[in-house]
């Protein structure tokens, strides 16, 4: 439940009675393993003296060979059967949406359909920096992001990096990365420069959700390993550099049948369109009713830097459908013609929907959850996150909506089915249209409008996690057997604990860099300036020393101010120990510790702009962002 890939290696070696060894591996060992389950985050599910855990082969995800080892994707659970990983709940959520989607499809006469699955194509953003420069930055080494750094003269203002020509070292890295991913069966499809300097993106071909999740975990691991071969470091943190865009992960999600039909693709017949509209309404209903869970699924200390910062979607969850589909829903809701040239009302199951070419509307990059022709693009995920959490929520919430639809329609006489269906879709649109917003999500006016509509605006991870154990959320997961209540409570504890630990590590790193690197360096530079000033006056009493005098005064004043901020951060960290609950600690870290960290950074970044380059103790933003050529 750390969100990263775990490994355990078993050899084929076995002893024989005569003291020799043979190579064998039993089917039992293949199907089930027994690793230690106490050393991972478990949220109280396992104690140190309760170490037994089990791995179980996931036969729906491909085995592969990596570094001459046969790697078998597995689920991980405790001795008592509680899920200790992100794979098990994902597989359960896929079963849930399969069950409920099949009920709905049978109502439309899809007798040849035997299963439904969700598919995902996650786009992965990342930064590349030079290894030698990375090694000189404690903050990057310890936390994955820069905790200090003045804005360089040039950032992303010229928009010249996005889709720009790829630099030779980066191109060589991408070529080897593609080759390594293809060897593992990961179909990397697209790569390009992103908006910020040194930022890039990789996108694979979509596949079944649990396989896509495994592939994305592997992709992040391989990206970092290949980078080292090229003297680079791949940064996956959501916000490694202040002042330029951070990195996210777009989760392109759809639903398809075993016959190859995409259930989010408008059909060619009235009946097929009625089916599409019902599934569309299920997604709309799910996103509206469980907007808090979707926000929680992407909540992390790193992602808090992105959401709502005019580089990523706002923290308010909303849906973008595009103008054409919006007009269709409006026509159904109000029983009016879809087009002013038509005189007949739009009726579900009677009319053929107009075709929706994928390029008829601009892609709304400010929307957290956008319809893009035959899929939804969930854009709130952070770049380091496992895509499992978001897809567990999405699958389960849509399964619940489909269950309610099936409960309403099953048993309905054939002669009244279309009328009941039309009413159901119409009522769903009326009840959940507040979640649909096709405008600019970066506009402050939208935040006010969202509040008026009653949408949640959970701005930080502690604020979001406070709703994780709401009664409706527990009921959702337990009713579909995706999580037990015990498993939910353990995950809540793990998420809070992780948030606190991340901010604590960042704060301690800032203090370490300030006291051991920045303050001594600036003091040395001020001393050198003072020495230069005294030498000039000794050689020529009339010499103008105003530059040195003014700069020494300013450096001394700012150094004293920064030292005061260091002590303030230390005092603030000490107060955390006085708080008993994880909830209180997480909120304190967000409201008090994080604020003290920002205050400390302001002073340090100003000192960087005044200190000579040869005295500054670590590489600058200019070095890092433009150092790979």
What are the roles of these predicted feature ranges?
Residues 38, 47-236, 245-248, 254-493:
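Glycine-rich, acidic/polar active-site loops that bind/position phosphate-bearing ligands
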Residues 428-629:
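C-terminal amphipathic alpha-helical interaction region
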Residues 7, 243-246:
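Short glycine/serine/proline-enriched coil/turn segments at secondary-structure junctions
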Residues 18, 285-293, 400-411, 520, ...:
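Short, well-ordered loop/turn and helix-capping segments at boundaries between secondary-structure elements
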Residues 21-22, 134, 231, 261-262, ...:
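Short amphipathic alpha-helical segments with coiled-coil-like heptad repeat character
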Residues 25, 364, 498:
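Residue-level signal for pocket-adjacent positions within structured domains
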Residues 1-49:
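Short acidic/glycine-rich loops and adjacent helix/strand connectors
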Residues 240:
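Glycine-rich N-terminal segment of FAD-binding domains in flavoprotein oxidoreductases
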């Amino acid at each position: 439940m750390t969100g990263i890939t775990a490994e355990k290696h078993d050899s084929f070696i076995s002893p024989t009675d005569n003291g020799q060894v043979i190579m064998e591996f039993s089917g039992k060992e293949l199907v089930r393993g027994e690793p230690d389950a106490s050393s991972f985050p478990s949220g109280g599910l396992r104690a140190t003296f309760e170490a037994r855990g089990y791995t179980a082969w996931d036969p729906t995800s491909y085995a592969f060979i990596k570094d001459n080892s046969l790697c078998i994707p597995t689920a991980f659970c405790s001795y008592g059967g509680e899920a200790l990983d992100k794979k098990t709940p994902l597989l359960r959520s896929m079963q849930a949406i399969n069950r409920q989607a099949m009920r709905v499809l049978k109502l439309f006469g899809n007798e040849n359909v035997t299963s439904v699955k969700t598919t995902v194509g996650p786009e992965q953003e990342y930064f590349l920096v030079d290894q030698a420069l990375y090694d000189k930055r404690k903050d990057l080494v310890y936390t994955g992001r820069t905790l200090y750094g003045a804005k360089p003269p040039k950032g992303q203002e010229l928009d010249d990096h996005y889709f720009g020509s790829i630099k030779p070292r980066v191109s060589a890295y991408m070529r080897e990365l593609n080759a390594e991913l293809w060897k593992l069966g990961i179909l990397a499809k697209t790569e390009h420069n992103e908006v910020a300097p040194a930022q890039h993106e990789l996108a694979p071909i979509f596949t079944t959700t649990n396989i896509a999740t495994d592939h994305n975990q592997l992709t992040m691991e391989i990206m970092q390993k290949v980078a080292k071969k090229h003297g680079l470091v791949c940064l996956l943190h959501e916000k490694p550099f202040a002042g330029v865009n951070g990195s996210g992960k777009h989760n392109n999600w759809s639903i398809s049948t075993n016959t190859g039909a995409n259930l989010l693709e408008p059909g060619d017949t009235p009946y097929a369109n009625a089916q599409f509209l019902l599934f569309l309404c299920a997604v709309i209903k799910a996103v509206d009713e469980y907007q808090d869970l979707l926000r929680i699924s992407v909540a992390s200390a790193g992602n808090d830097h992105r959401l709502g910062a005019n580089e990523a979607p706002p923290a308010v969850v909303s849906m973008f459908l595009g103008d054409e589909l919006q007009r269709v829903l409006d026509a159904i809701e109000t029983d009016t013609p879809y087009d002013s040239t038509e005189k007949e009302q739009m009726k579900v199951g009677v009319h053929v929907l107009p075709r929706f070419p994928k390029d008829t509307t601009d892609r709304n990059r400010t929307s957290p959850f956008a319809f893009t022709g035959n899929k939804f693009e969930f854009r709130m995920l952070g770049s380091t996150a496992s895509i499992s959490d978001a897809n567990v929520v999405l699958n389960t919430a849509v399964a619940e909506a489909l269950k309610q639809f099936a409960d309403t329609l099953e048993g309905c006489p054939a002669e009244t089915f279309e009328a009941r269906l039309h009413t159901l879709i119409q009522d769903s649109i009326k009840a959940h249209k507040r979640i649909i917003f096709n405008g600019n999500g970066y506009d402050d006016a939208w935040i006010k409008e969202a509040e008026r509509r009653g949408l949640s605006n959970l701005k930080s991870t502690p604020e979001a996690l406070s709703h994780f154990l709401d009664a409706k959320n527990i009921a959702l997961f337990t009713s579909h057997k995706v999580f037990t209540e015990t498993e939910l409570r353990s995950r809540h504890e793990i998420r809070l604990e992780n948030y606190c630990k991340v901010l604590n590590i960042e704060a301690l790193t800032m203090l370490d860099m300030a006291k051991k690197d920045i303050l001594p360096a600036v003091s040395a530079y001020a001393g050198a300036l003072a020495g230069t000033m005294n030498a000039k006056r000794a050689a020529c009493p009339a010499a103008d020393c105003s530059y040195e005098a003014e700069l020494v005064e300013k450096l001394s004043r700012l150094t004293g101010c920064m030292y005061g901020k260091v002590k303030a951060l230390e005092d603030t960290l000490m107060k955390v120990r006085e708080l008993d609950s994880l909830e209180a600690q997480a909120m304190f870290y967000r409201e008090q510790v994080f604020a003290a960290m920002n205050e400390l950074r302001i002073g340090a970044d100003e000192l960087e702009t005044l200190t000579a380059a040869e005295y500054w103790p670590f590489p600058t933003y200019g070095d890092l962002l433009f150092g790979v050529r």
